[in-house]
C-alpha cells in the first residue's frame, strides 16, 4: 500500500510540475491545485492508517489510534487550497477580461512600456 501511495504522490508531483511549466494561466492554476493535493497525500501518509486502526472516540480499551492531528491539518490545507484556487481563477478571469490574453508570454508587455 505504501508503494502505491508513493507512486501516486510522485505522479501528482510530476503532473503538477508539467502543468506549472506551461504558458497557459489556467494550466498553471490546475498544476498548483495538483501540487496541493500531492502535499495533502504526503501529510496523510505520515500518519498511521489501515484496517486495523480505530477512531480515537472509542470508550473501551483500544490500542491503535489514527492520529487526528494530521487529518485536521489536511482539512485546513484543503480549505486554504480551495480559497487560493478560487482567488487565482478570479484573478486570471479579470486579467483575461482586461488584456484578452491567457498566456504568460503575452502579459510581459513591450520594452517601450517602461
Curated annotation (Swiss-Prot):
Subunit annotation: May form a heterooligomeric complex that consists of seven subunits: mnhA2, mnhB2, mnhC2, mnhD2, mnhE2, mnhF2 and mnhG2.
One Gene Ontology term of the molecular function aspect: antiporter activity
Keyword Ion transport: yes
Sorted UniProt keywords: Antiport, Cell membrane, Ion transport, Membrane, Transmembrane, Transmembrane helix, Transport
GO cellular component: plasma membrane
Similarity annotation: Belongs to the CPA3 antiporters (TC 2.A.63) subunit C family.
Topology of this chain in the membrane: Multi-pass membrane protein
Xref: NCBIfam families: PRK12660.1 (NF009303)
Name the record gives this protein: Putative antiporter subunit mnhC2
Residues passing through the membrane, by range: 3-23, 25-45, 72-92
A Pfam family matched in the record: Oxidored_q2
Localization per Swiss-Prot or TrEMBL: Cell membrane
Location (main, coarse): membrane
GO BP of this protein: monoatomic ion transport
